[in-house]
Amino acid sequence: MPRGFLVKRSKKSTPVSYRVRGGEDSDRALLLSPGCGGARAEPPVPSPGPLPPPPPPALAERAHAALAAALACAPGPPPPPPPGPRAAHFGNPEAAHPAPLYSPTRPVSREHEKHKYFERSFNLGSPVSAESFPTPAALLAGGGSGANGAGGGGGGTCGGDALLFAPAELKMGTAFSAGAEAARGPGTGPPLSPAAALRPPGKRPAPPAAVATEPPAKAAKAPSAKKPKAIRKLHFEDEVTTSPVLGLKIKEGPVEAPRGRAGGATRPLGEFICQLCKEEYADPFALAQHKCSRIVRVEYRCPECAKVFSCPANLASHRRWHKPRPVPAAARAPEPEAATRAEAREAAGGGSSDRDTPSPGGVSESGSEDGLYECHHCAKKFRRQAYLRKHLLAHHQALQAKGAPPPPPPPPPPAEDILAFYAGPDEKAPQEASGDGEAAGVLGLSATAQCHLCPVCGETFPSKGAQERHLRLLHAAQVFPCKYCPATFYSSPGLTRHINKCHPSENRQVILLQVPVRPAC
């Protein structure tokens, strides 16, 4: 909230016209007649009603005796009343009360406490806060002062006029405390502070220790101690090295003292030294841009395919695809018809191609470390079966080029593609129903080819039955048949992809059957 947003009401009083009731005037006249002893007569004020009966003399005598005992303890005589009659009761109260009007706020110093109680009570305050109905203690105090003045000098007056214009201190809550203070005397207790004098009557009085140590109202505030927040910040700065929030812990420095700079000033962040070549730099940016000669790029090369990795874990994951599988000796032995194909060896020797860095995740039927996938036409060895099939396809294309020109063959499928074959040669596959072209497309051969290629070892056969018989006898350990259809695969990942693609519902049912059934409640 901005400063000065709330408007405070001023405590200064403004002159207000008011009228004193007639009943109070009659009571004041009755009190003046026995107490003043005819010392001073005041013109009566006409009242609309009959006057009340005078109080009994016993009550007046008791009031005079109590007030005389209270004034006997006071250290000095009461102040002399102002001379002259005060007959004006209407209009501006300054005409009837010529004493200067004071502000209800108390000064900073305590000089006003040295005055007498009645002088302070009658001169301080504003007529606006005067009581229309004075309390009995105030009436007794006014009557006693008049009696004392009459007995002492003979020309005194009673306090009835002053009671009509009494300040706010003669209210119900403070009249008895003021009378008790006057009866106690100034030396029996500590004087009242300005804050205690301005405190409303309903609140409890402040303890003596608080009153004695209360600073002045407008005095400059003493400089307070350092804020605890700043102290907390300094405390946190000391604990930066062991901050549990960062998750780090800075270890202690070396035992020997660090070397100082040439200029003599200390570096706030320490020395910027390369930990490998021990070279020192002026700032952290120069150290970051420094390329140490000892830092070399470490390469992890696969011994099977010469593929390079930057992490040993990646190389270990890659080498799982290079598990050596023993190839039967019958597959390594050359076929008798290999001599008849010697002419095609020179023609198709340059057409073969091999990838330098093949992908490790696609094929799992890789050869051993020596590359035992050998072509029977040209005795060329390959690390992977897919490379051998691609090479054999080039041999077949070269053989067909000598005869009728065949149509362009489809691109060679990967090793995990489907290869459908059945248990016996008498059974007919669905692919053969539409002709030999589709089956040849699966094998990567043209429709006009009269030989059938073994997908594992690359051997060619003149008929489909001979190829299936060869696969059953020699490559039964490397065949992965499908559980839901007669298709057969030569790699476990190929079979897994086939099941996920072609048999997702059956695979899901198998997984659910493996989970134990919960008994019904």
Curated annotation (Swiss-Prot):
Expressed in adrenal gland. Expressed in the dentate gyrus of the hippocampus and the wall of the lateral ventricle. Expressed in pancreatic and intestinal endocrine cells. Residues 2-7 are annotated as: Required and sufficient for interaction with KDM1A. Residues 209-223 have a biased composition (Low complexity). Residues 43-56 are annotated as: Necessary for interaction with CCND1. GO terms for biological process: adrenal chromaffin cell differentiation; cell migration; cell population proliferation; endocrine pancreas development; endocrine system development; negative regulation of cell population proliferation; negative regulation of protein phosphorylation; negative regulation of transcription by RNA polymerase II. Residues 1-20 are annotated as: SNAG domain. Keywords: Cell cycle, Developmental protein, Differentiation, DNA-binding, Metal-binding, Neurogenesis, Nucleus, Repeat, Repressor, Transcription, Transcription regulation, Zinc, Zinc-finger. Disruption phenotype: Mice die during the second half of gestation; lethality is caused by heart failure due to insufficient catecholamine synthesis. Display pancreatic, intestinal and sympatho-adrenal endocrine cell development impairment. Exhibits fewer terminally dividing neuronogenic basal progenitor cells (BPs) in the neocortex. Residues 334-346 have a biased composition (Basic and acidic residues). It is found in: Nucleus. The keyword Cell cycle applies. GO terms for cellular component: nucleus; transcription repressor complex. It holds the Pfam family zf-C2H2. Gene3D superfamilies: Classic Zinc Finger. The C-terminal region is necessary for NEUROD1 promoter DNA-binding and transcriptional repressor activity. Sequence-specific DNA-binding transcriptional regulator that plays a key role in neurogenesis and neuroendocrine cell differentiation during embryonic and/or fetal development. Binds to the consensus sequence 5'-[TG][TC][TC][TT][GA]GGG[CG]A-3' in target promoters. Acts as a transcriptional repressor of NEUROD1 and INS expression via its interaction with cyclin CCND1 in a cell cycle-independent manner. Negatively regulates skeletal muscle-specific gene expression in endocrine cells of the pituitary by inhibiting the Notch signaling pathway. Belongs to the INSM1 family. This is Insulinoma-associated protein 1. It comes from Mus musculus. The lineage of its organism: Eukaryota, Metazoa, Chordata, Craniata, Vertebrata.
